[in-house]
């Protein structure tokens, strides 16, 4: 049986302008907490992030394990290789759809959470099948 594909929608400029500051604030918080600020080479490390993309996972939809070091997404107008992945959770009224790292570490996420993690092969992750309802998230990548 063929895997059901998730519905992906890119954002409009108006929505990007509205959500962008929240995403950037989450990035700044991550950088302050996890990156040594005294290292001069790190300052200004994150220059920008991609346009926000919305994902809808309907019942029966999942995303197989993968990692986000995706060169082909970043060969257009904004060039670069992703450094950080940004995931925002927009709702909770669904069942299943757990976010899992390394095939076994489930990350509990609720509506309004923004998770930031490295975009490289050391952080494989997946979204388990949604068994009831629809799961809505947004994603972006910083570089």
What are these regions (language model features)?
Residues 1-114, 122-143:
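Fe(II)/2-oxoglutarate oxygenase catalytic core
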